[in-house]
């Protein structure tokens, strides 16, 4: 496809006053299309089916799902209806904590100031705040990258870019900042089975911005890192426990183990809203199990014989001991520093 129909800046979630417009990420890179979301149930379906995906992006989408829910509410008892909408949205994706953070924030506002205008402003603030947050993550991440070589080769897993956020991205925010500072030689993007977010989405974003990218089969990461072709690994996150254990797309932990073995720094880039200080470790992070059809076939073409069984967790947990640094909008922290910094941020 050409990029003539694509905005210069990728915005996966947009609000037009009474409906929400999403980039349909299930059909990229071959087709670029948007879908208009008119109801809260449609938004829940879009999140569950990964039309919109990525922890920050589904938080933003859920916030506007709550605005849509308010529009649907019967007169006289909108809060009860909104609580039902919140429950439906919460049930869509269990691992990404940004979803719950955004819904709780919207409910708090609705109970304090129950009006459409106030909810719309809050959802818009979540969207705009996420873009600013991602840009800050990008700048902090740039400073955390190795000083040498001057032009870096970075490896990433899955898609933690503009498509996974309100715009700019977390891990790809670091990539974009490095590119703009002329410190980026190349990105290696793991294809990220089974849904191929690296091959389909990360590569699409980077080609769109003319950033050099090489797609790898997931099984190639050890070979490429071991041959000295990678200077640092930067990934996103769907939930980070207080001790720095990080849930991210399945396969991330394996990349972290490889990076540690070969002495390559491994960074996690995510907003503070992804950090769950209520969980002491990654053992408490719920791991979403997805449909076996994602592994059985690609675009209807069977990959395995009939009769086999599938195990399809969407995420794994990378132990904090394998993480060099966690890049958030306020700076870069060693995993052991995260909880204290989070408590200070909350004023506790």
Curated annotation (Swiss-Prot):
Keyword Lipoprotein, does the record have it? no
Q: What is its EC number?
A: 5.3.1.23
Marked site (Transition state stabilizer) residue numbers: 158
Residues annotated as catalytic: 238
Q: Which UniProt keywords apply?
A: Amino-acid biosynthesis, Isomerase, Methionine biosynthesis
User: From the UniProt record, which GO molecular function terms apply?
Assistant: S-methyl-5-thioribose-1-phosphate isomerase activity
Q: Which residues cross the membrane?
A: none
Binding sites annotated in the UniProt record for substrate = 53-55, 93, 197, 248-249
Give one GO biological process term. L-methionine salvage from methylthioadenosine
Q: Which NCBIfam families match?
A: eIF-2B_rel, PRK05720.1, salvage_mtnA
Function of the molecule: Catalyzes the interconversion of methylthioribose-1-phosphate (MTR-1-P) into methylthioribulose-1-phosphate (MTRu-1-P).
- What family is this protein classified in? Belongs to the eIF-2B alpha/beta/delta subunits family. MtnA subfamily.
| HAMAP family from the UniProt entry | Salvage_MtnA
Q: Protein name, please? A: Methylthioribose-1-phosphate isomerase
- What species does this protein belong to? Gloeobacter violaceus (strain ATCC 29082 / PCC 7421)
The coding gene here is mtnA
């Amino acid at each position: 496809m050409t990029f003539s129909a694509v905005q210069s800046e990728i915005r996966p979630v947009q609000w037009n006053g009474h409906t929400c417009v999403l980039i349909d990420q299930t059909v990229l890179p071959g087709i670029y299309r948007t879908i208009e979301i008119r109801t809260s149930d449609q938004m829940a379906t879009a999140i569950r089916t990964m039309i919109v995906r990525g922890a920050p992006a589904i938080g933003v989408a859920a916030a506007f799902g709550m605005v849509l829910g308010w529009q649907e509410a019967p007169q006289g008892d909108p809060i009860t209806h909104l609580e039902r909408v919140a429950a439906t949205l919460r049930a869509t994706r269990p691992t990404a904590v940004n979803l719950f953070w955004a819904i709780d924030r919207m409910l708090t506002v609705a109970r304090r100031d129950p009006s459409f205008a106030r909810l719309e402003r809050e959802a818009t603030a979540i969207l705009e705040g996420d873009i600013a947050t991602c840009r800050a993550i990008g700048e902090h991440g740039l400073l955390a990258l190795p000083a040498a070589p001057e032009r870096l080769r970075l490896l990433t897993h899955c898609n933690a870019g503009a498509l996974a956020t309100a715009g700019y991205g977390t891990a790809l925010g670091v990539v974009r900042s490095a590119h703009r500072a002329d410190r980026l030689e190349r990105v290696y993007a793991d294809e990220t089975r089974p849904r191929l977010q690296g091959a389909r989405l990360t590569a699409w974003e980077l080609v769109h911005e003319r950033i050099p990218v090489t797609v790898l089969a997931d099984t190639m990461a050890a070979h490429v890192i071991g041959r000295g072709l990678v200077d640092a690994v930067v990934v996103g996150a769907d939930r980070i426990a207080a001790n720095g254990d990080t849930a991210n797309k399945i396969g991330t932990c394996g990349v972290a183990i490889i990076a540690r073995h070969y002495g390559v720094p491994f960074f996690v880039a995510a907003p503070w809203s992804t950090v769950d200080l209520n969980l002491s470790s990654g053992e408490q992070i719920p791991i979403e199990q997805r449909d076996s059809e994602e592994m059985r076939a690609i675009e209807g073409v069977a990959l395995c014989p009939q009769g086999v069984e599938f195990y399809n967790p969407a995420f794994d947990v990378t132990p904090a001991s394998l993480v060099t640094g966690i890049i958030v909008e306020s700076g870069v922290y060693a995993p052991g520093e995260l909880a204290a910094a989070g408590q200070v941020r909350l004023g506790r």
